[in-house]
């Protein structure tokens, strides 16, 4: 039986008699400081938020967006330091990190921590992790996951009041030095589609100019911009834009209207609707407006932009602004909007790509932020979950039980199979619909969240590295934008040659040496055969055309695993505790019982003899197989809190908040008699821990 645990409410600062001094910030170099090194001693007198992140991680990008208004409000007393601790090998490349900081508009100092030195010093175990340091240099909070912004507001206010009274708060500017702006025609383009005969001129393409927060049409030369919608004109000076009451060049935001008025925020996926559907609904293109958490519609004739789905509030994790709460089967509060509601009232989460399923008559949406696929019927205006339970990982089976991980690319082939670039598992997945209408998910390439590499050959042994794009070819094969390997790869399913002999499935490399390719599309000749490949080369800020090669490459640079430190544990009982303290001004929502939950599993499954499964409470006794040597513990913790005062009932109209984090913790298992010094018999994690 699982022990139940009810966490305590958050105390006011100071929180503990014994305080822990924050560790030094050690890494390879600093970004956004004008070349200066930064130490915690330099930051004395400021409230410091250390944001442990990695640029592949959608949850980390959500946290960066959450922090922007907090940083703006407390700009004279708060310093955020991004500690970049990479998951993938490519993320340790300094040029790749430079590009990511620019692309995601990170406006605070960033410590490059490729060896995870500072990550380990602060006992970080998950991306993202936030550590709050007070103006005297002591750790006061350790937060995992998203959705902490309301609690951070109250915590920062308390710290400012306390240290202003003590005389230990220093107001003024911090160490952030903005980089010099660079003018470009395209800036970190994300996705592209061919317009066929529906563009301004033959052979033109529509491009998500993601870094400029706009959509552009480019000519067949892939460089000439024919027209732009949203974001302002990057060639126009800001003063001129203000004088004309137009959006500032590269302005992000959400606004419907004509091409000069509309605003997007990091748009990515694009879909050209069939002409008959477009005529019925009044727009031609569906846009995945990623950071606005919305689907948008674009008329090619007028440039008019409308909002199709999404209320602008990020689904599930970023629940700080959601005013209504639902409950799942365990009684835990969640902020899922009613999927049967008006699509404009539904919360989405970082839609990254869109594709058309002709058989279903629906737009399929890669909902990267919740690790799911959604569908949208543009005629009936109905939104629904297409596949995925909402947990991050690689699990095949019935669509409503499958696990995805930040799906970022979609393509439907001639047989109706939906191909998915599942970026965080470095996998290519597929969703197939049976004659009975039931959908199933399986994996063509890839093995899990922490396995990657550049290996061709047998799909069972092949490896990718964070692919973001996929396109199906007429011969049944699939091209993959293998983003972090800088390559275009090809998956060919099992087939039969002209002589009737079986040809096994295989993975090969089409081309390499690209700068983070995020999408790939194929141009066909007059005979319908593939002729050229167009690649969206994101970090080169361009589209590039590549001839289809006569032969494909076979590459084997080895399989890799994410280099996370392993925790030595003793076989047998392992006590798991997740700390959670509700922020000031909130209290645990106990109206329907214990509002906390743990979900535990392991890879391999045999690692856990007891303690797997889902139940309420934030403590559990796990039992590890003494025959096991190593593995990964997968832990998901949830807690629900609502605005309210301690000792008083929660008001009926109170805003409720869901806190959630997933951990994948590599462990090395030792027999008790042979365990090294320091091997753990308990595992303490923080969902929201105060010190």
Task: List the model feature ranges, each with a label.
Residues 194-202, 272-281, 356-360, 412-415, ...:
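Residue-level detector of Asp-centered blade-edge/turn motifs that repeat once per structural unit
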Residues 134-200, 552:
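Thiol-/selenol-based redox modules, centered on thioredoxin-like
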Residues 223, 548-691:
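Extracellular/lumen-exposed scaffold segments
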Residues 98-127, 131-133:
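Short, internal strand/loop/helix patches
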Residues 61-103, 114-118:
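Structural microenvironment flanking redox-active thiols in thiol-disulfide oxidoreductases
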Residues 52-69, 587-588:
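Conserved redox-active cysteine motifs that mediate thiol-disulfide chemistry
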Residues 170-190, 222-269, 303-352, 382-406, ...:
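Gly/Pro-rich loop segments of beta-rich domains
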Residues 2-40:
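N-terminal "domain-start" segment that seeds a small globular fold
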């Amino acid at each position: 039986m699982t022990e139940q645990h009810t966490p305590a409410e958050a105390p006011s600062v100071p929180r503990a008699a014994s305080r822990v001094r924050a560790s030094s910030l050690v890494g390879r170099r600093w970004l956004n400081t004008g070349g200066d090194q930064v130490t915690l001693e330099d930051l004395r007198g400021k409230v410091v938020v250390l944001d442990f992140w990695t640029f592949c991680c959608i949850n980390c990008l959500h946290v960066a967006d959450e922090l922007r208004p907090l940083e703006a409000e407390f700009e004279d007393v708060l310093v955020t330091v991004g500690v970049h601790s990479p998951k993938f090998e490519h993320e340790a490349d300094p040029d790749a990190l430079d590009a990511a900081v620019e692309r995601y508009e990170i406006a605070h100092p960033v410590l490059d921590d490729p060896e995870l030195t500072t990550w380990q010093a602060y006992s970080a175990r998950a991306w993202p992790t936030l550590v709050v340091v007070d103006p005297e240099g002591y750790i006061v909070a350790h937060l995992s996951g998203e959705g902490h912004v309301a609690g951070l507001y109250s915590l920062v206010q308390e710290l400012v009041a306390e240290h202003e009274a003590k005389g230990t708060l220093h107001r003024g500017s911090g160490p952030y030095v903005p980089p010099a702006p660079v003018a470009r025609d395209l800036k970190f383009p994300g996705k592209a589609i061919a317009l066929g005969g529906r563009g301004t001129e033959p052979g033109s393409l529509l491009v998500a100019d993601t870094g400029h927060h706009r959509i552009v049409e480019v000519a067949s030369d892939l460089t000439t911009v024919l027209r732009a919608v949203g974001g302002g004109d990057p060639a126009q000076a800001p003063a001129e834009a203000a004088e004309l009451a137009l959006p500032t060049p590269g302005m992000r935001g959400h606004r419907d209207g004509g091409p000069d008025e509309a605003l997007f925020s990091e748009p990515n996926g694009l879909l050209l609707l069939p002409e008959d559907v477009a005529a019925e609904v009044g727009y031609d293109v569906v846009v995945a407006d990623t950071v606005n958490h919305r689907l948008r519609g674009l008329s090619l004739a007028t440039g008019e932009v409308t909002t199709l789905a999404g209320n602008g509030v990020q689904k599930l994790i970023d629940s700080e602004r959601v005013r209504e709460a639902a409950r799942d089967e365990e009684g835990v509060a969640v902020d899922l909007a009613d999927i049967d509601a008006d699509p404009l009232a539904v919360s989405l989460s970082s839609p990254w790509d869109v594709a058309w399923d002709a058989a279903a008559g629906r737009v399929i949406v890669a909902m990267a932020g919740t690790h799911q696929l959604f569908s949208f019927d543009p005629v009936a205006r109905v939104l629904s979950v297409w596949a995925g339970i909402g947990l991050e990982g690689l699990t095949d089976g019935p669509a409503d039980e499958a696990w995805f991980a930040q799906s970022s690319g979609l393509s439907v082939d001639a047989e109706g199979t939906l191909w998915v670039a599942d970026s965080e598992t470095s996998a290519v997945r597929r969703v197939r619909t049976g004659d009975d209408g039931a959908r199933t998910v399986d994996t063509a390439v890839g093995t899990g969240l922490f396995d990657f590499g550049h290996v061709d050959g047998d799909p069972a042994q092949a490896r990718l590295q964070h692919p973001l794009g996929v396109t199906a070819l007429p011969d049944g094969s699939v091209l993959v934008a293998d983003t972090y390997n800088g390559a275009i790869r090809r998956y060919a399913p099992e087939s039969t040659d002209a002589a009737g002999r079986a040809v096994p499935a295989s993975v090969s490399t089409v081309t390499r040496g690209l700068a983070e390719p995020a999408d790939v599309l194929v141009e066909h000749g007059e005979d319908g055969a593939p002729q050229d490949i167009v690649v969206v080369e994101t970090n080169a800020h361009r589209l590039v055309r590549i001839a289809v090669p006569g032969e494909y490459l076979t590459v084997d640079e080895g399989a890799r695993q994410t280099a996370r430190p392993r925790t030595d544990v003793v076989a047998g009982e392992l006590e798991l505790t997740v700390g959670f303290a509700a922020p000031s001004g909130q209290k645990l929502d106990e109206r329907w019982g214990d509002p906390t939950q743990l979900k535990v599993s392991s890879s391999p499954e045999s690692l856990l003899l007891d303690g797997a499964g889902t139940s309420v409470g934030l403590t559990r006794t796990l039992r590890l197989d003494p025959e096991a040597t190593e593995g990964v513990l997968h832990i998901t913790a949830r807690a629900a809190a609502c605005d309210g005062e301690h000792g008083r009932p929660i008001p009926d109209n109170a805003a409720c908040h869901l806190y959630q984090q997933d951990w994948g913790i590599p462990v090395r298992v030792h027999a008790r008699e042979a365990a090294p010094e320091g091997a753990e018999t308990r595992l303490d994690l923080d969902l929201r821990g105060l010190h």
